[in-house]
Curated annotation (Swiss-Prot):
Coiled coil residues, start to end: none
Co-factor note (free text): Binds 1 Mg(2+) ion per subunit.
Statement: the UniProt record of this protein carries the keyword Cell division: no
Enzyme Commission designation: 6.3.4.4
Superkingdom of origin organism: Bacteria
Binding positions for IMP per the UniProt entry: 22-25, 47-50, 141, 155, 236, 251, 319
Protein name: Adenylosuccinate synthetase
Record-linked HAMAP family: Adenylosucc_synth (MF_00011)
Amino acid sequence: MTNKPSAATGRNVVVVGTQWGDEGKGKLVDWLTEMSQGVVRFQGGHNAGHTLVINGVKTALHLIPSGIMRPGVKCYIGNGVVLSAAKLFEEIEGLEKAGVEVRSRLRISEACPLILPFHAAIDIARETFREKGGTEKIGTTGRGIGPAYEDKIARRALRVQDLKYPERFAAKLRELLELHNFVLTGFLNAPAVDFDTVYNEAMLHAELLKPMMADVSRELNDAHQAGANLLFEGAQGTLLDVDHGTYPYVTSSNCVAGNAAAGAGVGPGMLHYILGITKAYCTRVGGGPFPTELDWENPGTVGYHLSSVGAEKGVTTGRSRRCGWFDAALLKRSAQVNGLSGLCITKLDVLDGIEELKLCTGYELDGQTTDILPMGADDIARCVPIYETMPGWSQTTVGVTEYDKLPAAAQRYLQRIEEVTGVPVHMISTSPDRDHTILLRNPYAA
């Protein structure tokens, strides 16, 4: 494995989560970066949370691509990302304190919409308003992601490039703040956001951002032509996609592989291999339907085992993740909308010691059976899972790096996932550590 580009055009891999996020994408992106020269974020914002464990040291990233932990690898934030400059510099400073060089290796698209303080204020006020009104909360992270995307779609967003022109920025900000303060004070019963505070902070960030501003689309295309291997790092998961997820309990961007092209400024022909990251069981943070959910709060239950052994706490919010059995019918939907080339099964080791495993292969819905997850939260909430029961294993799989050394029951479990979903398993993760990975087929050589 090497970080040197090939003589011909590079080969590019897209990494996406196939469930509700938190599948372990960060570790796999970091691992695959050993074979790439550039890592690209193409959607979401600092609502994402990627945890890397390298030589026993845990690092949490929210906005900066996971490839930053590999010396010499360039990292790109594409136009599909909504950018909080405040959170970006908080993250940069934390990495620099740990001895990681960031600023010379990070390129930020000038077309990124900005997340500003009033976006988070609206996000939080809306969730409070829903709760007081007796409506179930969406379960947002409260970081302003949704409101920032709303401004983008409404064609009124302030973008990174606007920071280069203070007078233009001020005029746009004043107009935008007038609208949002009207909503905050007149509808959501929340305090107004001060113009000067927002403007002055933005101008401080502008000077720091300027050296990293770039035409990311052009740089990625040039790097590809020069032979660089690129890795497109998805955030959240397919079932949180604004179109294909459990709507309305979703995020505000497209999390599927196809958005790697639009969110980074490359053609779809540059996406050569799609790797779907999938936990060996299911988890979900926040509200919304979850067909295979177990009792994960009471000791002695399988769900509690998954929650405690899997350390299922959200990286971004610290909220406990809901836990349940593996859902192959859900994964079949994810495979369809992403065009998956292969799977990486993570957290296989968490299943160690569970005597009997269940795998959902379909659902009963309104008197009918279906072998694929329906569209939309209302139908999914009415689904009754159809399970296959499989034997578990008592041997430890922690740190196993060869497929043949996995227990026979673990191998059969993985094979059944392949059979039901129609997608081959190409990688398996057996602990959070970077090196505890089984490689069956290299995405960069496939």
